[in-house]
Amino acid sequence: MKRLFLIAFLALLPSCNGIFPGIYDSGESDLVTGYGFIAHNPSDNSGKVYIDATDYTKWVYLDFHGRTAVTAGMSEEEVPAEWDIAVHRYDVKTNGAAVLETGITGLELFMSSGKMPEGEYVEDEWTTEKIIVDMSGMMDGNIGYSESWYNPELSKWLKVDTSTMPPLYSMSHKVYAVKLADGSNLALKLSNYMDASGVKGFMTIDYVYPVEF
């Protein structure tokens, strides 16, 4: 039993990501250099974000207004003044936004719809058991969590099934419609969760902001 827990622990560590590339992973390993907002097309407001979200003790705060990415610790004192969504590993929270998972799989198709989709947009919820920050006690059944806001709808962009070892990763491949707190709209899609070498936690996000039909 202890050996099984050890295998599970090693499989979940960031440093062990990519041990079984191409077998258990559904992401594509495209070579990307640089971090943050790495591409932006002003003609259609589309762009691409590439971030390192491998650290369990960090949030990466994304400001789509200013196209900036800031990595900070878990405390509220470290939260930047301007941000729209933040990523912790595969978890996501928003700065007062509401999110809808659409059935659309491409941003161009989303924009061709001509309007923001209707539906039940989901706001953040407070959680004490979603944001993992310490797995050092996993073998003893002790996992450390951080209390935090969490958006369950946007966090659907990547499912991690830990019922088998190594875990199975599957992206939703869907576009998420985000109504930001200032009334502007954002559309985004997770297109990868690995770097070129297969290490998990390196997130590539395609987006359109502001969404203007």
What are the residue ranges of the model-derived segments?
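Positively charged n-region of N-terminal signal peptides that target proteins for export
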Residues: 1-4
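C-terminal motif of bacterial Sec signal peptides marking the signal peptidase cleavage site
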Residues: 12-15
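Surface-exposed, beta-sheet-biased, low-hydrophobicity segments with strongly acidic/polar composition
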Residues: 17-213
